[in-house]
Amino acid sequence: MSTTTTESANPSLAAQEKIEVDFTPKEHYGDWRDEFHREGCIIIRNAVSPERAQYYVDKQIEWLKNFELGFDEKDESTWTAEHLPVSFRGGKYYYGVAHEKSVWEARTEPGVMDAFAKLWETDELLCSFDGIKIDLPRRKDVKWTPWPHCDHNPDVKGLSCVQGMLNFAPNGPNDGGLIWMKGSAKVFNEFFAEQRKNEDAENFDHKHQEFFKFHEDHMKWFEDRGYAFTKLELGPGDLVLWDSRTVHHSCFAAGDQIRHAQYICMMPKRFATEKALETKKYCFEHYLPNTHLPHRWVTQIVHHCEES
């Protein structure tokens, strides 16, 4: 079975989907949700045990080796593209990885599901069919450049998604990992009150995009208002949540530790259309990925599966 996935920007479909979600936080929760709503991001320590985190590390290494391209986690000479499956900045999104047994096990860890259920105050949740993250340090065949961005449509001014990442391996200051600009979600509307050019395209059409890459001068705008990037230091089993309006990116691994993580996002089922649910079911049955969004843009993906 071969699978081809193409994206279709269809305004009639986009119009059917609710983009900005109806979610007004309470004035006070008395737990980590207060910090999340204040800063737009939060680290939830020990969402899963270190033992379970190591299990997922082992499964990710096993997944890489199953391609039989000669990769050996103990032999740095094999940490090159010719020994690895296709990826994007360390993210593995293809080959049906979104539906690997261990990937689903991570999504359904009680500590992960409970965090999203607590945030949204419902256990009727949809999960993203997203990828895994494996960053090999000191790779000489990779040119790494900063790519500050937000996974949010610039034309949508309110909250539309809370992204998540479950960390599996020790992640210190010299290890590759997530960098975010804490609190930057609060000035998202102010920044995009002016017309902004996406660094990836001069004539960028925001209408069908959930991604914006910032220029260097954009970063100065945030810095002038007191915002700065922070490299997260995470332990095995820590869960990170952030408002998709938060400016973030990742840094290249310079130490000895391989970075292991998984992107996990859950949103209330009530935010999805019937069409989105139908297409999501199709994706699940055919081992197809979606974006970080569990409830939207599912209908923007046209799938064609044929016998090879």
Curated annotation (Swiss-Prot):
Pathway assignment: Secondary metabolite biosynthesis
Disulfide bonds: none
InterPro entries according to UniProt: Phytyl_CoA_dOase-like
Gene3D superfamilies reported in the protein's UniProt record: q2cbj1_9rhob like domain
Domain of life of the source: Eukaryota
Role description: Part of the cluster that mediates the biosynthesis of a highly modified cyclo-arginine-tryptophan dipeptide (cRW). The first step of the pathway is perfornmed by the arginine-containing cyclodipeptide synthase (RCPDS) avaA that acts as the scaffold-generating enzyme and is responsible for formation of the cyclo-Arg-Trp (cRW) diketopiperazine. AvaB then acts as a multifunctional flavoenzyme that is responsible for generating the cyclo-Arg-formylkynurenine DKP, which can be deformylated by avaC. AvaB then further catalyzes an additional N-oxidation followed by cyclization and dehydration.
The protein's name: Ava biosynthesis cluster protein O
Taxonomic source organism: Aspergillus versicolor
Lineage of producing organism: Eukaryota, Fungi, Dikarya, Ascomycota, Pezizomycotina
Gene that this sequence comes from: avaO
